Amino acid sequence: MKLIIATRKSQLALWQSEHVAQILKNTHQIEVLLEGFKTKGDVLLDSPLAKIGGKGLFTKELEESMLRKEAHLAVHSLKDVPSFFPQGLVLAAVSKREQSTDAMLSQNYKDFLSLPKGAKIGTTSLRRKMQLLLLRPDLEIISLRGNVNSRIEKLKNNEFDAIILAMAGIKRLNLDKQVNFVYEFSKDELIPAASQGALGIESIKDEKILELLKCLNDENALIETSIEREFIATLEGGCQVPIGINAELLGDEICVRAVLGLPDGSEILKDKRMIKKNDFKGFGEGLAKEFITKGAKELLKKAESII
């Protein structure tokens, strides 16, 4: 049997797809091929992500290729995957999670507190912008698009004092070797995006394919990301609004951190809870409903109106 993986052509996306392909080859001794596609998010590089917005910015073209039967599965950064899937497609697996944290890369400043007043910080994410300004209102946060290499180049050319990336991507592509300083934020400083650090394997609804993909599943990652995705789905928040949610398994307990608000950090809702591992089902939805009673929907609408 031969499996075809639909993938974006970025360096990180290709790494992720190759990683999954290797596991499938080693486990099942089958042929696995990669088919590259450009998504809307890859093409529209001049606008901030929040302005072009929309669900499936980095997934739609890959999903269409599967529905046309040109591919059997697609490997995504799960944080980019909408909560609901097109008919005929399913989230087949969530692989073992890497670090879910964010990190600051800089040529001149070893940590966040050492950044000078008015320092220029590059990031694509309103979630990061909101929390960075909450910690340091004196910083200048600038939209940073483009592939990873172009972002690193802009940092080295002193267009930015620092840039913010996901720690998982930094590790996967060895970016820490390309800059002088990497500062990893704690989850209390910067609450990560839902499913950050996890890979989501989306596939066609086919029993044989789904059986083959079972080997990619990680129970802990499934538990953590199900809480996070439930929270986002209940709030109806896409990845372009300022929401952070992270569930972290610690033995038989789970630490859940959540935040949402306005991009400038002037208004936020934030919470941190410890729950029993056995109580994870429905917790994300329940927490989101608590946020809604505190005005979360109105706050997110306000955020969307000023993006």
Curated annotation (Swiss-Prot):
Pathway per the UniProt entry: Porphyrin-containing compound metabolism; protoporphyrin-IX biosynthesis; coproporphyrinogen-III from 5-aminolevulinate: step 2/4
Species of the source: Campylobacter jejuni subsp. doylei (strain ATCC BAA-1458 / RM4099 / 269.97)
This enzyme's EC code(s): 2.5.1.61
Subunit structure: Monomer.
Gene3D superfamilies to which the protein is assigned, alphabetical: Periplasmic binding protein-like II (3.40.190.10), Porphobilinogen deaminase, C-terminal domain (3.30.160.40)
Domain of life, per lineage: Bacteria
Cofactor: dipyrromethane
Family matches, as CDD domains: PBP2_EcHMBS_like
This protein's record includes keyword Signal: no
Keyword Transmembrane: no
The protein's name in its UniProt record: Porphobilinogen deaminase
Remaining remarks: The porphobilinogen subunits are added to the dipyrromethane group.
Modified residues annotated as S-(dipyrrolylmethanemethyl)cysteine in this record: C239
Annotated Pfam families: Porphobil_deam (PF01379), Porphobil_deamC (PF03900)
Chain's gene name: hemC
One GO cellular component, as annotated: cytoplasm
Coiled-coil stretches noted in the UniProt entry, renumbered to this chain: none
Cofactor note: Binds 1 dipyrromethane group covalently.
PROSITE patterns in the record: PORPHOBILINOGEN_DEAM
Family statement drawn from the similarity comment of this UniProt entry: Belongs to the HMBS family.
Reaction equation(s) it catalyzes: 4 porphobilinogen + H2O = hydroxymethylbilane + 4 NH4(+)
Top enzyme class: transferase
GO molecular function: hydroxymethylbilane synthase activity
Swiss-Prot/TrEMBL GO biological process terms: protoporphyrinogen IX biosynthetic process
